[in-house]
Amino acid sequence: MTMSNLHPGFILIAVGLIALFVPKSLRRPVLAAGPLLGLGAVLTLAPGTNATLPFINGITLHYLHVDALSWIFALIFCMMAAIGGIYACHNSNRMEAFCSMTYAGSALGVTLAQDWLTLIFFSELMAATSLFLIWCKKTPASRQAGYRYLLMHMFGGNLLLAGIFLKVSAGDYLVMPLAQGPWDTAFWLICLGISINAAVVPLHAWLVDAYPEGTVTGSVFLSSFTTKVAVYCLIRIFAGTDFLIWFGVLMALYGACYAIMENDMRRLLSYHIVSQVGFMVAGVGLGTAMALNGATAHAFSHILYKSLLFMCAGAIIYATGIRKINQLGGLAKKMPFTFWCFVIAALSISGVPLFNGFISKSITISAAAAAHYGSVELLLQLAGVGTFLSIALKMIYFIFLAPDNGVVIKREVPKNMYVAMGIGATLCVLYGVYPELLYRYLPFTMEPYHPFTVDHITQSIEMLGMAMLPFMMYLPKMAPHTALSLDTDWFYRKPFAGIVTGLSYLCCAVSRALGNTWEVLYEKSMELSHNPMEFLDAKPLRNSSKYNPENYRTSIADPIMITLTILFCSLCYFMAII
């Protein structure tokens, strides 16, 4: 393996392993400089680079495949790993350092995989390592949110795994587009599995539940990888699947509306992950070269400005210990650098001209107009208004500009966090002013796109003005307040809690009615468990002169179905009690 085909994901995983074992004095330079090696490896990868590994039964693992699409996602993932490493290098938690780098490396593993088995391996590694970024906070809320996160990703991972098994059993080992059909069982299983990772509404509640409970540094990584890896997979596998258009529009509006009602900083930002990923999913559904480039560009931009928003929120929580917006105020004077970085990130996510969100979001909206989806164009613009209202206006005013609530800066923010925030803010402005730095690497051929036309700029200013006027008119009513907002997880957590309670009462009633008979049934069932086929068969072959191991052998489908049934029941149970 030479530098020209060195897998950058392996480098990041190695950085994580080193950070796990070295003393704290060496961990800081490892986290700060290690990801730069991965970034260098990405820059040396040329389109067409491939690397394989022989596997069992003549199967070959294509663990490294580089084309224009995988390269640009690998680039931004390594850039984010480097920024996140700088932001987190003051952290003394070696497990968190290991999981964050391995998580980023696994995201690269999925991105550069060309076969289904490699993809599912790194996808599951992503789920496992991201879980510990939530649990590393070590609070009851993070532990419970982590369990719910685990159960949802077990469910989604098993759907994806089942679909991949169907593809592999049919001899389809390589990751190929599925949108053109057939829309068979494998298609739907893989689509559902990826949709859970993409937080497609109504399968999104795990994200808003878990990401705010991560550590200050861990949430920065969480906001950057899982959903964007899912977007990459959707572009690669399901481009042009038209029903995704409307799911994307629903996500964009749903996330923006719920964000307006939120009082918790990181929950609000998490809802906007759902909203912004909706733009990408809609672009995937449109399926044109322009729309797919828009989805790719917006994923690139989103990672930069969303991570910057989470870094700023993390700095506020680190300094003050406060997460609720209504408990903050007057921080512009107390944390001026954080304030200006937040302003840049807020203007970027709102799609204000000269910031990177504008040069990417406008491509998807223009693609919808070009494809004659006028309603999609309008609804996505309305979602942009909601974004500007809840982040650029609500968060900036009530956190930084509102009268001081007596917030005390309990500890100084480490300099490395400021450095990472400064890098993120610089990139948001740089790509916004010079969009060709991004456009030249977009993977699909399309007509030259110029974002800074009079029409685009005027339309953007008009839409943002629509949000500013009502905010100023109804400022007292826009003040955040503590309230319970029910999300889609209520529909499975509340009913299943009743089901679990009812089943518990039923089991107790049956146990009391049976009395000693219950013990007899238990003993018989234990005897039966040693040879369940003896119960299913009318008469075993007792007189057979020779032992035949095939007598009681059942199809492999039976234990698989039993296992999946147990997993599903366990999922329902734990969702109800957690």
Name every feature range the model reports, one short phrase each.
Residues N50-L64, A170-Q180, I235-I237, K361-A368, ...:
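Membrane-interface helix termini and inter-helical loops of multi-pass transporters
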Residues I83-L119, A128-V413, V433:
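Hydrophobic transmembrane alpha-helices and their helix-loop junctions in integral membrane proteins
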Residues R411-M466:
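Hard-cation-handling environments
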Residues M1-F98, D172-Y173, P177-L178, K494-A497:
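Transmembrane helix-loop-helix hairpins at membrane boundaries of multipass inner-membrane proteins
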Residues S348-I363, A425-M446, T517-K524, S570-A576:
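Alpha-helical transmembrane segments and their membrane-interface junctions
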Residues N57-F73, Q180-F187, A367-L380, Y449-H456:
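Short aromatic-rich membrane-water interface segments that cap or initiate transmembrane helices
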Residues K24-P35, Q144-L151, K333-C341, R411-I423, ...:
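Alpha-helical transmembrane segments and their helix-start/interface "positive-inside/aromatic belt" motifs
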Residues R440-V454, M478-I578:
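Aromatic-capped, Gly/Pro-kinked transmembrane alpha-helices
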